[in-house]
Swiss-Prot record:
Residues 1-21 form the signal peptide. The presence of a 'disulfide through disulfide knot' structurally defines this protein as a knottin. Its main location: secreted. It comes from Cyriopagopus hainanus (Chinese bird spider). This is Omega-theraphotoxin-Hhn1a 3.
Amino acid sequence: MKSIVFVALFGLALLALVCSASEDAHKELLKEVVGAMVVDTTDAVQAEERECRWYLGGCSQDGDCCKHLQCHSNYEWCVWDGTFSK
């Protein structure tokens, strides 16, 4: 009877250890995924700043905006200029 209780407690301790290690690995994976997402977002913002501004992007003149967009005079963001051609 005593040995069964000892084995059960040992099994529970082992299970707790495995679950703890699994949780730590899960947290590390989550940190890596979030870090990759932040890097991708930063790269996208830098690419947008190097090229033309997309819809509702900040601007100071029409030349800052992409094709078929113009700089709104009051709010200083790129809006559609009303054209449909390619």
